[in-house]
From Swiss-Prot:
Residue ranges occupied by any TH1 domain in the UniProt entry: 774-957
Entry similarity comment: Belongs to the TRAFAC class myosin-kinesin ATPase superfamily. Myosin family.
Name of this chain's protein: Myosin IC heavy chain
Alphabetical UniProt keywords: Actin-binding, ATP-binding, Cell projection, Chemotaxis, Motor protein, Myosin, Nucleotide-binding, SH3 domain
Domain of life according to the entry: Eukaryota
Residues reported in the UniProt entry to bind ATP: G109, E110, S111, G112, A113, G114, K115, T116
Lineage of source species: Eukaryota, Amoebozoa, Evosea, Eumycetozoa, Dictyostelia
Length: 1182
């Protein structure tokens, strides 16, 4: 498989080998030569199988860690791209996902070799690729990712320092565990820290610095913090000037302090806790400035009490108690098990300085541990899942003077080397032997003997001897170091140990190191004086007290744990944790001790190559196997690759796992030399073979996905075709429904437009029913209340006459006549324009001035003053409107019923309506006037004579208007002639004792020639109107179709002739206003007596009504020939108002199909063959 180089790799010429297992000649010199070639070309990473070798370049290589490079390594195997720390991170993360096992990355090497930077890149990669980048729905995941990245600057500030070998040397060890959820997203974490070099707080070698945070704080603190905590430049504090080095080349402490503050904020440390941290840092610096001066009697006293006072203020402890704790040591005499007397023993200057430094070291050590615990608290995840650990621990150190700290650091590195040997050399070879694999053992150095020298119990190791001496000398300092050198001589039997005067030498895997004996016992005790502990626990600062929860037990004889015991226990726990995980190794190399770029010292690097055991590692890798797995695990991973073990992604194998493994390898044509079968595992020799299997496995799913996609595309194409057909059918169906809906909506709008007027009319009819004879014009059921028959809003002369009322909403208007009372003549009717608004009644008269018609306001009556109405009981048109404060209004109008209804509706109440043969009302000038009403059958016109109205008889007072059918959907509407009957239309039942108007019988002509009445004028909107009657077949006059004329009764004109018959079905006019069709002709015998039953009237109330004829069921039997249909001729034109009705013209011939009831018949129009309902009084039989 050809390697694909990322962009940064393609920009440089590849020198040397990416994988040193491919060296033609294996030797340390060849390894050095390969590393040197690559280093000179800025290629710092090289592989030995799965082990990454990293050489510290001491410079930034442009593009090596960019986001583009990081993305290229996602999902790639280690042989596909050049060696890189991202490749190790990718393999670690994918191994956790695929193998479902914990992983760890062990980074080893000496101080300054680049371990910390490698650890940061590992965590950066895992945080970047795990989950969905920057878009995770889980806020906890995003928070943990932020903490993973921000712990590095925070812990580096408090735990790293400049040393002679490294400008950013880790002075503590940490093992960072990243915990993942089921979605493989980081959801928790834990940091374990090891052996902080707290002695650096009070002492540094020449050329070294204290921990970074002190210099950052001194230079980056705000003016307020400087004032409050007494912070100045680092040159002002004794603890920061021990090494005579205050700066690091290329490092800005102010910028670094800003990063440290930001890390605290991201991790979640609140401002008040940050303030306490900085306060304790200032206290430590000022403790270092406390100096002592000797006095007589080997005593000391504090030289400058102002410094003591300021330290007391920072620690929130009483100044005199702190002074006593620093100048004296509390002692207690004992008598057996009984406590004796306590007294203070003065300290000499050396003891006082040691006590002062011990106090500063204890505060910093507890503060550092608190920071680690605070980070762990933010990342705590109670649900434990898979884990990836990253070990970044101090590297192997050798100085001119090496003490207890270097001894502990090198011990931990010795343990890590032992783990490396166990996994890469010893355990691998032992496994080959155990599995029966053909193998030639390769000798290697096992450093187990060195580890036993340091941590052994029998014979005792160096740590055990240190603890024994500490217990023996207890609180005595004199002679402790000499006692150690005497006791440690028992280790001379170990070939890796030797004594040299006041020191001893240990032959580590990385070389011989001489450790100085003096001071080791005191540092191993690692105890805080009881006096100092007591003074800290009495502090008023709860944060400081929380750092020292120790319980002081003066009666306990148990000695506290030593530093050696703690580091040995922590190392054992670390090894146990690492052994439970699958390890991945990064071996770092330091190219020079000058910490300068582009310099590789051959001898220095060769020494590291040797003690790291790279040569042995290459030999074992070349002779060994790249991959091994149990039969079952291999089968479960790769069963997809053989047709014998898999079908459509399902496991179909029925045999044992070993046979399945053979079948899988055979199906992939793997040669027998490329693998071996052990007792329980299968071993793959070359990594290329393993990656080929993985690529085939991935391609299987790709091929399956392609097949599924093709099938899905075919299904989608089929679905699309079906969808188009359904859409077309549905579109046609929607068009059909739309056309139907439009037709229905047209009828519904017409019905809806008329419905409120009909309802208002039907309600108002109850006021008149049985109390006043009715005009035939009023009985036309189709006529709706139009209201504004004069169209006042478009007539400016009306608006001008109304003056202030011109902006009022008009609800009624018509031409009318009012009763006027001339002084010297009889009362008479005078023409007026009657306009009713929502506020008042207006009477406007037309007056001629200088041959010009002028409209003037005659009278205005507010609606609020209208109290009641009076009408006669006869068929006249007089309406008297009574008012509360003005004289009454006596007006004649064809629309009296509508006028009463609209005024009642506007006032929101039903005013009293009085009926009688005479009406008394107040006329102008405050006097009363009485008009009477007389029946006069000799005159068809209504006329007024001497306050008497002469009126012919009208329709009986019990006559009612037929209600409009409001449910046309229940009546079938055939679209073409059919032979079967149609259901009976729904006709409203008459109310109370009233009757519904029927077709009248023909009336006899009068003795003289018929008197033609003036046509009824209509409003501009189209008011009801009548035409002159045409002669009936018998010679009697018949009503013609009325022609529209401008608005209500003409002023000064006579009353309108009423139609001879009423129609019980609504017929709309083209303009939306009601329009009368031709009425049926009157009978030759003339009008019937008033109140007498005639063919035009239904049965009186109380008698049963004829039920509607039910629709007969069709029968399959052949019917006999139907008799010839009865034919009728249309007397008037009729426009259908509802879907089931028939539209016809005058003189059209109609075949009668069925008489549904007396009012409505079903017929067939001969001209168009259409079938529908028709009013019976509009036709006459031929």
């Amino acid at each position: 498989m050809a390697q694909q180089k990322p962009e940064w790799g393609n920009q440089m010429k590849n020198e040397g080998l990416d994988d040193m297992t491919l060296l033609s000649k294996v030797s340390n010199d060849q390894i050095l030569d390969n590393l040197k070639k690559r280093f000179e070309k800025d290629i710092i990473y090289t592989n030995i199988g799965d082990v990454l070798i990293s050489v510290n370049p001491f410079k930034f290589i442009d593009g090596m860690y960019s986001d583009e490079v990081l993305q290229e390594y996602i999902g790639k195997s280690r042989i596909e791209l050049p060696p890189h720390v991202f490749a190790v991170a990718e393999q670690t993360y994918r191994s956790m996902i695929n193998e479902k096992e914990n992983q760890c990355v062990i980074i080893s090497g000496e101080s300054g070799a680049g371990k910390t930077e490698a650890a940061k890149k590992i965590m950066q990669y895992i945080a970047d690729v795990s989950g969905e980048r920057g878009s995770s729905s889980n806020q906890k995941v995003e928070h943990v990712k932020s903490i993973i990245l921000e712990t590095n600057p925070l812990l580096e500030a408090f735990g790293n320092a400049k040393t002679l070998r490294n400008n950013n040397s880790s002075r503590f060890g940490k093992y960072f565990e990243i915990q993942f959820n089921q979605k493989n997203e980081p959801e928790g974490g834990k940091i374990t820290n090891y052996l902080l070099e707290k002695s650096r707080v009070v002492f540094q070698l020449k050329g070294e610095r204290n921990f970074h945070i002190f210099y950052q704080f001194c230079r980056g603190a705000t003016p307020q913090e400087q004032q409050e905590f007494g912070i100045y430049g680092p040159e002002n504090f004794a603890y920061l000037t021990k090494g005579d080095t205050l700066d690091i080349d290329g490092v800005d402490d102010v910028e670094e302090f800003a990063l440290t503050r930001n890390a605290m904020n991201v991790i979640g440390i609140p401002a008040n806790e940050q303030k306490q941290i900085f306060k304790l840092l200032a206290a430590i610096l000022w403790i270092g400035n406390i100096d002592f001066k000797e006095q007589a009697g080997d005593k000391v006293t504090i030289a400058d009490t102002s410094v003591l006072d300021f330290v007391s203020q920072l620690l929130d402890v009483p100044s005199h108690f702190l002074k006593t704790a620093l100048e004296f040591r509390q002692m207690e005499t004992r008598h057996g098990n009984q406590r004796g007397t306590q007294y203070n023993v003065p300290l000499n200057k050396t003891q006082a300085i040691a006590g002062r430094d011990a106090l500063a070291k204890a505060i910093y050590d507890r503060l550092f541990n608190w920071l680690v615990d605070r980070i762990n608290k933010e990342m705590d995840n109670p649900q434990k899942g898979l884990m990836i650990g990253v070990l970044d621990i101090y590297g192997f150190e050798v100085f001119d003077r090496n003490g207890f700290e270097q001894f502990c650091i090198n011990y931990v590195n010795e343990k890590l080397q032992q783990i490396f040997i166990e996994f890469t050399l010893k355990m691998e070879q032992e496994e080959y032997v155990r599995e029966g694999i053909k193998w030639e053992p390769i000798p290697f150095f096992d450093n187990k003997i060195v580890c036993e020298l340091i941590e052994g119990k029998n014979p005792p190791g160096i740590f055990s001897i240190l603890d024994d001496v500490c217990r023996a000398v207890h609180s005595q300092a004199e002679g402790a170091d000499q006692k150690l050198l005497q006791s440690i001589a028992v280790c001379k039997s170990n070939p890796h140990f030797d004594t040299r005067g006041n020191a001893f030498c240990v032959k580590h895997y990385a070389g011989d190191v001489v450790y100085e004996g003096p001071g080791m016992i005191e540092k191993n005790k690692d105890t805080l004086l009881k006096d100092h502990l007591e003074i800290l626990q009495m502090s008023a600062n709860n944060f400081l007290v929380g750092l020292f929860p120790d319980v002081i037990d003066t009666d306990s004889k148990k000695l506290p744990s030593t530093a050696g015991f703690k580091i040995k226990s922590q190392a054992a726990e670390l090894v146990a944790t690492l052994m439970k995980s699958t390890p991945h190794y990064i071996r770092t190399i330091k190219p020079n001790d000058l910490k300068k770029p582009n310099i590789l010292e051959g001898g220095r690097v060769l020494h590291q190559v040797k003690y790291l055991g790279l040569l042995d590692n290459i030999k074992v890798r070349r002779a060994g196997f790249a991959y091994r797995a149990t039969f079952d695990r291999f089968f479960q991973r790769y069963y997809l690759l053989s047709d014998k073990t898999c079908y459509a992604g399902n496991n179909i194998w029925k045999g044992d796992a070993l046979s399945a493994c053979r079948a899988i390898l055979a199906s992939q044509n793997v040669d027998n030399t490329q693998y071996q079968i052990g007792k329980t595992k299968i071993f793959i020799r070359y990594p290329e073979m393993l990656f080929s299997l993985e690529e085939t496995r991935e391609r299987y799913w790709h091929d399956m996905a392609s097949r599924i996609k093709n099938a899905y595309r075919n299904y989608k194409a089929f679905q699309f075709e079906c969808s188009n057909r359904i859409k077309n059918a549905f579109r046609n169906y929607k068009l059909y429904r739309q056309r139907c809906a439009q037709t229905i909506q047209g009828y519904f709008r017409a019905w809806k437009q008329a419905s409120p007027f009909f309802d208002l009319r039907m309600q108002n009819e109850q006021l008149f029913q049985g109390r006043k004879e009715r005009n035939r014009f009023s009985m036309i059921s189709v006529r709706k209340y139009f209201g504004d028959y004069l169209d006042v809003r478009s007539q400016s002369y009306f608006l001008d006459a109304m003056a202030e009322g011109r902006n009022e909403d008009v609800i009624f208007s018509s031409k009318s006549q009012v009763m006027v009372h001339p002084i010297l003549s009889a009362n008479k009717l005078s023409p007026r324009f009657l306009i009713v608004t929502k506020q008042a009644i207006y009477l406007i008269k037309l007056k001629q001035k200088k041959n010009l018609a002028t409209y003037l306001l005659d009278r205005r009556v507010p609606l609020a003053e209208v109290t009641s109405f009076s009408l006669s009981s006869l068929a006249d048109n007089l309406l008297v409107i009574h008012t509360s404060t003005q004289f009454d209004v006596a007006v004649t109008t064809e629309f009296k019923t509508e006028l009463v209804a609209l005024i009642n509706k506007q006032k929101g109440t039903t005013l009293a309506v009085n009926f009688g043969q005479s009406i008394q009302y107040f006329k102008k000038k405050g006097s009363n006037n009485t008009v009477t009403f007389l029946k006069d059958e000799m005159h068809k016109e209504i006329f007024l004579k001497k306050n008497q109205f002469h009126i012919a008889s009208g329709l009986p007072a019990s006559t009612t208007v037929a209600k409009v059918r409001k449910n046309p959907s229940q009546v079938s509407t055939p679209s073409k002639p059919i032979a079967k009957p149609v259901a009976k239309p729904m006709v409203a039942k008459p109310s109370g004792g009233s009757v519904i108007m029927k077709k009248p019988a023909p009336a006899a002509p009068p003795s003289g020639p018929p008197v033609m009445k003036k046509p009824a004028p209509t409003a501009p909107g189209g008011a009801p109107m009548m035409k002159k009657p045409a002669p009936a077949p018998g010679g009697a006059p018949m009503m013609k179709k009325p022609a529209p004329v401008p608005g209500g009764p003409a002023p000064g004109g006579s009353a309108i002739m009423k139609p001879a018959g009423g129609v019980s079905k609504p017929l709309p006019s083209p303009t939306g206003a009601p329009m009368m069709k031709k009425p049926a002709p009157t009978a030759p015998g003339g009008p019937a007596p008033a109140g007498a039953p005639t063919p035009m009237m239904k049965k009186p109330a109380g008698q049963p009504m004829m039920k509607p004829i039910a629709k007969p069921q069709p029968t399959p039997m052949k019917k006999p020939a139907a008799p010839p249909p009865q034919q009728y001729i249309a007397l008037y034109e009729y426009d259908a108002m509802q879907p089931d009705e028939l539209t016809f013209k005058e003189n059209d011939v109609i075949n009668l199909i069925k008489k549904v009831d007396a009012d409505w018949w079903q017929g067939e129009l001969v001209r168009t063959k259409q079938i529908g309902m028709l009013p019976s009084n509009y036709v006459q039989q031929i």
